[in-house]
């Protein structure tokens, strides 16, 4: 921090005025400027040897230059001349605090400065820092508050408040002051990094993104990536991790791509035997297969893997490279549902975790475990050998202490463990497992809790009772953490938890038409219910929904379309059952594909993805063919002056992806017919037939809806129509009259017969009718 000298209110002699000018000109420069200014002030001293201002200014320059003895001598001389000179006391305090690292000695000088000027904000701030360095957080906060009262623009007091509140585990207050500090001093990368780790612990993802996106310290790239993961921006998160990996040594960087901790043996072997582009292609496929949504090219799962590796290096790789056993489990399975450690015992055990504990305890200790509450490992770990020695013929003592002579579980009433321990519970792996880790050598290197060794006293107690030591040893071996993990890895090599996500239900439909050059025009219509997108706390606002449409063939991504959709939310469109409709067009070769359609509201955990296997027929054949039937809300002739995003072949088709209508509403069906044959007069003649069925308790029954076919010369009503024309391909629509329709689900079948050669083709579609309001 720069030295701020108090305004000297005294009669200035010309040399003193010159000295003040020299100081001000040099204060914002560098060491050379300070050194030159100090020489100029020394040259002025013989003319004004008793000027406290001259000595104080000279001491300030020496302080900047880090010259402890010269600075201290000049400032002490200034105080000898004028003991009320606040700036001299302040400077001397900083000499003790910064150059001598003696915060206790600095306190009395800052206090002297404040006796001379109680509103001296910098002195309050430096006194606060001196108290903080002595561990006197309460006094430090009091002085920081005073500094802010007198000068709110100072940055240092906010940092001290942030750090002291963080030390007191008051993260809410700490975050407030860290943010205010960085607003005033955004260039402090070190403090910003500390702040980011606080935000990480508090899971303040939006703030973490805001801060880390402004930093250029490579150490914060994993923090930025983590924030991006929680924002749903997985490709950007993956890019941030790769930028971070590029700054690491080769041995460290390779840890992130190595899939050995999460892959099967054959996959790990394949990884080790590939290099270069072949390895990258292998990794792309590996992560795509494991990606639960398959809408980001595997980035969703891969970015999470990188995050876990970074977390394991940071938390579990301190004493062992690259990480101890906890890190290996964390990379494979992620954050446990419940965790308790010997350093931070977690006595709040959710019902799901308690169920896992109780089942394991019952298998190990029988009915004796019923009255015990477990707050640590259920599996017995090393304890003091004289704790609970009275075992009554079983591994459970008559005094209620479970376990063996030297190994016991950790319960609410008994923790005599002699080794550091951690207990992790995953409720969604193998119907729930507990994994216990211990640091047997007190080295900070945790491994699976070892299988206990029975003492002679343990065997003797079994012999006196009805239990079998061999049976108990068998259970200990079967339920040992190492054995449990080895068993579940063979069935579930990795885990990706989606439990924190909330569903965002929407509707979609996929329709296929003939395209150009032998391709198929795949049309995906999406309808987002406004009421599903909106949240209760939303004001009248516009929110962003990211829409993704991905087409896959196996693990290969054929096409990906991503777009951010602005959805307006206000009192007028809430609770109205309204839909925001979007259309995506994909040109693709015929064949079998997997379609993935995803919608996620940005900056929330609301997301939904739907998958569907598509068999896209080859419309390039010469036989009579019919496109998919599009159930629509309306079909009108397209206006060439106002093109619509829902237009196709001269028609403006308003999609109805939900395919839900109310009785009395019109229902339109758009279709395309291909490869009609002309007769000897160049005419085409074909017949369209429609059937509508619904399913009741008595089975399927046909419904006599009237269909109204659009014709250039008028409209024709009926369930079979004969049409004539001259084109071999037709695209048209008809309207169904739902005025008499009852609520329920209906199947529409359309059949086309070419009356020239008697070829027939058909398609079907579904729709529902809801009760009128």
Question: What kind of feature is each model-predicted range?
Answer:
Residues 133-135, 167-169, 200-204, 218-520:
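Residues within mature, well-folded domains
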Residues 29-39, 64-77, 98-112, 133-146, ...:
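Structural signature of tandem alpha-helical TPR/SEL1-like repeats
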Residues 448-773:
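Intrinsically disordered, low-complexity terminal regions enriched in Ser/Thr/Pro/Gly
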Residues 47, 81, 116, 150, ...:
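Structural marker of alpha-solenoid helical repeat scaffolds
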């Amino acid at each position: 921090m720069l030295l701020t000298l108090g305004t000297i209110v005294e009669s200035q002699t010309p040399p003193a005025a010159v000295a003040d000018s020299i100081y001000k000109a040099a204060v914002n420069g560098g060491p050379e400027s300070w050194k030159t200014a100090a020489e100029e002030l020394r040259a002025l001293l013989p003319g004004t040897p008793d000027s406290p201002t001259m000595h104080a200014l000279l001491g300030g320059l020496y302080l900047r230059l880090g010259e402890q003895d010269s600075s201290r001598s000049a400032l002490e001389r200034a105080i000898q001349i004028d003991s009320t000179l606040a700036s001299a006391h302040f400077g001397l305090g900083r000499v003790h605090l910064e150059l001598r690292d003696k915060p206790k000695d600095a306190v009395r000088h800052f206090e002297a400065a404040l006796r001379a000027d109680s509103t001296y904000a910098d002195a309050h701030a430096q006194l606060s820092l001196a108290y903080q360095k002595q561990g006197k957080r309460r006094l430090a906060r009091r002085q920081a508050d005073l500094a802010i009262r007198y000068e709110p623009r100072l940055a240092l007091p906010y940092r001290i408040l942030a750090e002291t509140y963080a030390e007191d585990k008051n993260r809410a207050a700490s975050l407030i002051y860290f943010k205010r500090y960085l607003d005033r001093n955004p260039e402090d990368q070190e403090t910003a990094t500390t702040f980011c780790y606080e935000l990480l612990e508090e899971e303040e993802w939006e703030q973490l993104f805001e801060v880390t996106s402004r930093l250029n310290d490579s150490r914060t790239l994993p923090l930025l990536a983590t924030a991006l993961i929680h924002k749903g921006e997985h490709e950007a998160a993956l890019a941030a991790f790769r930028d971070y990996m590029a700054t690491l040594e080769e041995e460290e960087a390779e840890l992130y791509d190595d899939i050995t901790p999460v892959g099967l043996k054959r996959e790990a072997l394949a990884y080790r035997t590939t290099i270069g582009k072949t390895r990258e292609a292998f990794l792309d496929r590996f992560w795509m297969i494991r990606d639960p949504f398959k809408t980001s090219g595997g980035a969703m799962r891969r970015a999470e893997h990188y995050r876990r590796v970074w977390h394991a290096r940071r938390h579990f790789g301190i004493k062992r490279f690259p990480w101890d056993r906890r890190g290996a489990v964390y990379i494979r399975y992620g954050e446990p549902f419940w965790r308790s450690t010997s350093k931070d015992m977690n006595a709040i055990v959710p019902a799901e975790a308690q169920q896992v504990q109780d089942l394991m305890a019952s298998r190990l200790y029988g009915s004796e475990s019923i009255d015990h509450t477990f707050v640590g490992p259920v599996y017995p770990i090393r304890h003091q050998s004289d704790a609970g020695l009275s075992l009554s013929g079983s591994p459970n003592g008559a005094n209620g202490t479970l376990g063996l002579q030297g190994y016991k579980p950790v319960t609410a009433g008994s923790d005599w463990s002699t080794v550091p321990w951690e207990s992790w519970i995953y409720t969604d792996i193998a119907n729930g497992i507990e994994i216990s880790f211990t640091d047997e050598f007190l080295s900070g290197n945790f491994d699976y809790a070892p299988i206990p060794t029975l003492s002679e006293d343990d065997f003797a107690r079994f012999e006196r009772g009805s239990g079998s030591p061999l049976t108990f040893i068998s259970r200990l071996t079967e339920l040992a953490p190492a054995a449990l993990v080895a068993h579940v890895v063979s069935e579930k090599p990795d885990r990706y938890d989606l439990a924190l996500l909330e569903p965002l239900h929407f509707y979609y439909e996929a329709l296929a038409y003939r395209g150009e050059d032998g391709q198929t025009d795949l049309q995906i219509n999406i309808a987002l219910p406004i009421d599903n997108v909106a949240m209760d706390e939303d004001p009248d606002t516009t929110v962003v929904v990211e829409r993704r449409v991905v087409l896959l063939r196996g693990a290969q991504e054929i096409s990906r379309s991503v777009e951010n959709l602005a959805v307006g939310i206000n009192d007028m469109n809430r609770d109205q059952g309204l839909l925001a409709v979007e259309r995506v067009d994909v040109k693709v070769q015929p064949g079998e594909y997997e379609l993935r359609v995803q919608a996620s509201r940005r900056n929330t955990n609301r997301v939904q993805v739907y998958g569907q296997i598509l068999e896209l027929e080859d419309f390039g054949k010469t036989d009579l063919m019919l496109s998919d039937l599009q159930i629509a809300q309306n079909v009108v002739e397209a206006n060439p002056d106002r093109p619509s995003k829902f237009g196709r072949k001269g028609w403006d088709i308003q999609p109805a992806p939900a395919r839900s209508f109310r009785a009395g509403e019109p229902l339109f069906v758009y279709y395309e017919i291909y490869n009609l044959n002309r007769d000897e007069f160049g005419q085409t003649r074909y017949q369209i037939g429609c059937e509508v069925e619904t399913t009741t308790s008595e089975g399927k029954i046909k419904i006599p809806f009237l269909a109204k076919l659009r014709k250039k010369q008028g409209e024709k009503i009926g369930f079979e129509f004969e049409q004539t024309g001259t084109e071999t391909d037709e695209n048209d629509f008809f309207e169904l009259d739902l005025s008499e329709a009852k609520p329920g689900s209906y199947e529409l079948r359309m059949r086309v017969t070419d009356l020239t050669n008697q070829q027939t083709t058909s398609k079907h579609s579904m729709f529902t009718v809801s009760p009128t309001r």
